[in-house]
From Swiss-Prot:
Residues that hold acetyl-CoA according to the record: A376, N382, Y383, S401, A419
Record-level GO BP terms: cell morphogenesis; cell wall organization; lipid A biosynthetic process; peptidoglycan biosynthetic process; regulation of cell shape; UDP-N-acetylglucosamine biosynthetic process
Catalytic activity, as annotated: alpha-D-glucosamine 1-phosphate + acetyl-CoA = N-acetyl-alpha-D-glucosamine 1-phosphate + CoA + H(+); N-acetyl-alpha-D-glucosamine 1-phosphate + UTP + H(+) = UDP-N-acetyl-alpha-D-glucosamine + diphosphate
Positions of region (N-acetyltransferase): 247-453
The keyword Cytoplasm belongs to this UniProt entry's keyword annotation: yes
Subcellular localization(s) per the UniProt record: Cytoplasm
Co-factor: note: Binds 1 Mg(2+) ion per subunit.
Family statement: In the N-terminal section; belongs to the N-acetylglucosamine-1-phosphate uridyltransferase family. In the C-terminal section; belongs to the transferase hexapeptide repeat family.
Binding site for UDP-N-acetyl-alpha-D-glucosamine: 6-9, 20, 71, 76-77, 98-100, 135, 150, 165, 223, 329, 347, 362, 373
EC number per UniProt: 2.7.7.23, 2.3.1.157
Protein name: Bifunctional protein GlmU
Native source organism of the sequence: Burkholderia mallei (strain ATCC 23344)
Length: 453
């Protein structure tokens, strides 16, 4: 089967410089969702028709299995499909999809394709309580489809029809080529409608078959930011329902956003207002607190991420604890039982098994061993204004509060670093390191008094 995806429209009602089909749904372009659905049907040819913002669209979805046809002028859906004909296999039927209709199920399209075998012309229709704005499916007294009429060209009787055309069709390609060549544009829009092909198919003796999706939202398109927001909520609720069915506990299914792939083990619990982006894995027994953002991360069994934490490109070991208000940046690796607490930032650094940095700390470009205690206010000074250097802290080190490690520097196993120390030289194992300070206490000191105005 050939699949053609129409993605050439301007999307004026989006009021955006970004081509409509590139607006994100769940963090990915609308068009990418449609391409994924098309791929699931294993087409022999996959062609995307581009026009407005053609090069931008091409760059966003380019792949070895995707071919592109260009519609220089947006002269209607029939004209758009015609641009793809040279790239299609005429011996295979063609399924036409739309780059701004992202939620159609693969099973729905397969059902339509199966119904349109043996040189039938298949149309996906849906019955709406309010069909305003859509083309109507006109049938005769026997229930056979006779034509599809667009809203602007419909008579008062036809406007009362509640079965509408979704625009998604399956047609025999060789005949479709002839029918498209014979299309006229004698209509209110002056465009070449793909829907007008139906009458030609009937005249040629082809049976018009219709199927409907299981859910009305499968055929909803995006023409405005409001419609985009509506589809985002539908899609996110579908994803939440799938997580619930898989045994994930969601504090509120309406307050989770998945903008990528979220794989969960058993007994995973997710609190409200969490966002998951890219590829995220939550192993058995993971708990995610409220208002967390987790991107491209792997979190091992039994780990806990407390509220308001932000993880990006991080790996969290079994039974580790993160947060609240922690930030793990790309390259952060926490071993089993490690703790990273409030207002701690870890970047391109490893924290060994059982090590803890519980308060107000920056650990960047560092290798920290097991059972290390990092006191509040500790900073690895990794940048000299031109280059970054690593800090190495071996196992069983105790780091007092308000400590700075000026990289490159290595601190040996079992070292104790006194509070307020700046470490700029390597320290051998089991040493106490501190900066000499004197403390002076003076009697008779009087605090200043605020002057009266």
């Amino acid at each position: 089967m050939n699949i053609v995806i129409l993605a050439a429209g301007t999307g004026k009602r989006m009021r955006s410089a970004l081509p409509k089909v590139l607006h994100p749904l769940a963090g990915r372009p609308l068009l990418s969702h449609v391409i994924d659905t098309a791929r699931a049907l294993a087409p022999s040819r996959l062609v995307v028709v581009i026009g407005h913002g053609a090069e931008q669209v091409r760059a966003a979805v380019a792949a070895p299995d995707v071919q592109f046809a260009v519609q220089e002028q947006q002269l209607g859906t029939g004209h758009a499909v015609r641009q793809a004909l040279p790239l299609l296999d005429p011996s295979q039927p063609t399924l036409v999809l739309y780059g701004d209709v992202p939620l159609t199920r693969t099973a729905t399209l397969k059902r339509l394709a199966d119904a349109a075998t043996d040189a039938r012309y298949g149309v996906l229709t849906v019955t709406l309580d309010d069909p305003t704005g859509y083309g109507r499916i006109v049938r005769d007294q026997a229930g056979c489809v006779t034509r599809i009429v667009e809203q602007k060209d419909a008579s008062p009787d036809e406007l009362r029809i509640d079965e509408i055309n979704t625009g998604i069709v399956v047609a025999p390609t060789a005949q479709l080529s002839m029918w498209l060549g014979a299309l006229g544009n004698d209509n209110a829009q002056g465009e070449y409608y793909l829907t007008d092909v139906v009458e030609q198919a009937i005249e040629a003796g082809f049976e018009i078959v219709t199927t409907q999706p299981d859910d009305e939202w499968e055929t909803l398109g995006v023409n405005s930011k409001a419609q985009l927001a509506e589809l985002e909520r539908i899609h996110q609720r579908n994803l939440a329902d799938a997580l619930l069915a898989a045994g994930v506990t969601l504090a509120d299914p309406a307050r989770i956003d998945v903008r990528g792939t979220l794989a969960c083990g058993r007994d995973v619990s997710i609190d409200v207002n969490c966002v998951f982006e890219g590829d995220v894995t939550l192993a058995d027994g993971v708990t995610i607190g409220a208002n967390c953002v987790i991107r491209h991360a792997a979190i091992a069994a039994g780990a806990r991420v407390d509220a308001f934490s932000h993880l990006d490109g991080a790996t969290v070991g079994a039974n580790a604890v993160v947060g609240p208000y922690a930030r793990l940046r790309p390259g952060a690796v926490l071993a089993a039982d490690a703790h990273v607490g409030n207002f701690v930032e870890v970047k391109n650094a490893t924290l060994g098994q059982g090590s803890k940095a519980n308060h107000l700390t920056y650990l960047g470009d560092a290798d920290i061993g097991a059972r290390v205690n990092v006191g509040a206010g500790t900073i690895t000074c990794n940048y000299d204004g031109a280059n970054k250097f690593r800090t190495v802290i071996e196992d069983d080190v105790f780091v007092g509060s308000d400590t700075q490690f000026v990289a490159p520097v290595r601190v040996g196993r079992g070292v104790t670093v006194a509070a307020g120390t700046t470490v700029w030289k390597d320290v051998a194992a089991d040493m106490l390191v501190l900066n000499d300070k004197t403390q002076t206490a003076k009697s008779g000191y009087v605090r200043p008094v605020k002057k009266k105005s």
